[in-house]
Amino acid sequence: MQNYGAFSHAKTTAHIDFDAITEIFTQTHNDGRASLYEHEVYRVMESIGSETPPQVKLIPRGTRPSDDELMSIPGKKVVLKIVSPTIVHKTEVGGVRIVECEPSKIRSAWRRMMYEVPEKYARWIERHADASPKEYAGLSGTALEEAISMDLKGVLLVQFMPPDSDTFGNELIVGIRRTREFGMVLSAGLGGTDAELYAERFKKSQAIVAASTKLTDGETFFSHFRQTISFEKLAGRTRGQERIVSDDQLLECFDACILLANYYSPTNPDAPFIIDEFEINPFAFTDFLMVPLDGLCRFSLPQKTVTPRPVAKIKKLLHPDTIGIIGVSASRENFGRIILHNILAEGFPKEQVRIVREGCDEIDGVRCIPSVSTEGKLDMLVVAVPAKHIPAVVDEVIQKDAANSVMLIAGGLGETQDSHERAQQVIAKINKAHESDDGGPVFIGANCMGIVSRPGGYNTWFIPENKFPQNGLGTPRRAALVSQSGAFMLFGLSRYPHLSPNYMISMGNQTDLTLGDMVTYLKDDDNVDVIAVYAEGFNDLDGLAFCRSVREAVLAGKEVVFYKAGRTPEGKSATSGHTASLAGDYMVAESCVRQAGAVVAQTVEQFQDLFVLAETLHSKRVDGNRLGAISGAGFEAVSMADSIDVGTFTMKLAPFSEKAASGMRTLLKEKHLESLVTVSNPMDVTPAGDDELHVELAKIMLDEPTVDAVVLALTPLSPMMQSLDTDRGDPFSMHNETSILTRVLELAKQSNKPLVCASDGGMLFEPMREALNKAGVPVFQTADRAVAALARYVQSRLHAKSIRCGGCGIR
């Protein structure tokens, strides 16, 4: 049997009776249902090792139970719960009653529920039509009540097990959910009927945490859970609260859920069923026992999986020896012609390029051929024809094995409902080709703006050269920018021309190659240390593949910067549990990618800032969170101190040793500033501080063992600073040998710690900022932004370091 834990080293204490659980699913499936009743969920709980599921007895609709049957549940009180395949949230519709354990009281409550529940549920559905179960579509009034009533299977008698405490935070929700992008996801946090409210109101990851079950184990998930308010309450860490559950119990619960999820998972080829949702809400606690008080489970049959794409062929896409282009006009500057010009302008050999065009000998000195298969197999084929012609081109390329990789430029292939059918036809052809012995060609796009590959020596963006971002003139850096949106990449590089990645890759619609595929390739590319990814959505299970590759990239010493667009809350269905709302799609994506080791940006601005820092500081050592800060303006010093806390992480203002402080005082005395400037952190050197003082103070801080990074805020408006783009020899010229620019560049080369600059002051001083950025010293417009960006970057570096120290590899 496979190991269904996420890690080969996982210490799992849980024992799962998979045969018993599969039998429960089989019986339910044969009964025509795709969801378990509550008492069946408790049977699953017993099969995964739960110690204390409550005793239950189903009273089927239409039966006349005896007094003995009604009194079969121990205790002075008993809980009555309505049983229906369409009612999940029973409390909201009057489907839960607690009564004295007496036959007459039970019968009265039971009969009342059989009438009142349909009435209340019907009113709820009429108020929430969008969340109505499909079984009741189009029904209202009496017809709706009757349909609901017909679905009532009876009432479940449940053992009443009062918790030790009913105060806030003493209930726990634990849920498994099958997600389209990340597969099986485990979540846990504050439970009960107000679980969604807690998740909405509390800070991120305070009420609930989530993780992919293939990317974690019980111990790792428990370490995340320990950061929540839920754990604080359960562990008795709040005033007046006593511990009500042991760490081992929680760990065993998480272990069992991970094993359960990974067995009944779409990633398990042997899975007899797939769990779509499994939830216990809540677990209550009595005398150090975890008591499940309600549960749901939905499941489905396994679906056929798609043949993996031959990711190794991405090498031919990024490093082609031969390039073909379809769609080049001989008479005008269309997209194909612009792409041709950009390929040649980047220096790709003209004799290695072919234009696919009948009736034409050459265009711009490049030879034309009548079809894609005329002169053997191409490494890369750029298809710049309208979308309606793409299916025929794809057919020809596949049938004649004409190319190793294909770039689909045109849109109109899946973005709209009208183009959906055409897209599905193309996808089916490509997937079929991947079943061949060599895997067939790989396709990037459609709706792809192109690729700039410095190592491959080409540029296929359809942007005219005179409108192209000027970063093309800069020295390539060991980074890759992968963007689902070409426009996002283009606009970002226009705003940040000092960004200069080796690869700039527009993924488009992910008709074939995915974000996960590209990171899988780039994690092993020797030209890349930093991978920045802008994502709008993942293909089926590609989020999981993406995270696995992120983790492997991090373990290999690389950095991954990630931004996910689209945070709209998912629609809520009456037949879904709380888990889907608590751990929504964006929250799951952010959690999984962050836990894999990437730094996750919350805004586009953060993404660009973090990419700049990763590109320029990757080779620097980051050993801690102790910051040294220098400014020539008092307000900047204050703003830097105010910016060290970024919510999930805090930089510390480093203390200075007596040796360092003495060196600083000596510098101040030499500059006759000892009566004006105090040694502190942040250090305000006032506008009287010259270029030398700024840099020498920064050098002392960088040499100080108690400092891990330095932010140096320049004051270009100061009369003491050489900050203008004037001729050398001018007293304010940044080109002088004693200028702040010259000194900072030399200091950055000497130090192995991060040095980040800030330079306010408007466009007059843009040349100095640009010179620093171009030389690899990151510069921000404001000091507070510099500190906040550095804090997030340091957090990610320390997180990645902890992952590498753990040495855990994802299967």
Identify the residue ranges that each predicted region occupies:
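Catalytic-core regions of core metabolic enzymes
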Residues: 1-811
